[in-house]
Amino acid sequence: MSVMASDKACAPVRASRPFPKQKLRELVLQALYALEIDPEGEDSLVSLLMTEASVSKKNAAYALMFCRAIRANQPDLDALLDATIRTTTLARLTIIERNILRMMLFEHQQNQDCCPVPVAVLIAETTRLIKKFSYSEGSSLILAVLGSIFDHPAPALDTPLEPTSMCG
């Protein structure tokens, strides 16, 4: 426990529990979906996430930060995905499938320097998110695309997050 220097009684302060990465990914996916449906709705997104996902304002804002970074890199992410997908186009995938691909690709590229997430973890999370938010029939294409991309070194992002944003 730590104490706050500004408190006269020096009352102990409990550190908040770290926000689980699985929950963060779900929030980011929901935010990406909402913004693809309503691109002008970012102003109300934090309160929407707080209400619908029952999370704190801090955690909703944290998820929105990732959402913004993914959207800032979307042209590069989509170009890589379009170059990898062979049997269809990115535009023909569902909104959820596109955003799962973007999010996992972003996380893979983002964390290469500071704390790389093992590919097996990203694949397992992709599978979990597809089962929870999409149709399992689409999982083989999504997993094949990510597997193909993860086999090669990740290109650098134009708009990275803070170096330790996804770490810990």
From Swiss-Prot:
One example GO MF annotation: RNA binding
Signal sequence annotation: none
A cellular-component GO term for this protein: cytosol
Entries under InterPro entries matching the protein: NusB-like_sf, NusB_fam, NusB_RsmB_TIM44
Keyword terms, alphabetized: RNA-binding, Transcription, Transcription antitermination, Transcription regulation
Disulphide-bonded residues: none
Biological-process GO terms, alphabetical: DNA-templated transcription termination; transcription antitermination
Pfam family, one: NusB
The keyword Zinc appears for this protein: no
Similarity comment text for this entry: Belongs to the NusB family.
NCBIfam families on file: nusB, PRK00202.2-5
General function of this protein: Involved in transcription antitermination. Required for transcription of ribosomal RNA (rRNA) genes. Binds specifically to the boxA antiterminator sequence of the ribosomal RNA (rrn) operons.
Descriptive protein name: Transcription antitermination protein NusB
The species this protein was found in: Chlamydia trachomatis serovar L2 (strain ATCC VR-902B / DSM 19102 / 434/Bu)
Designated gene of the protein: nusB
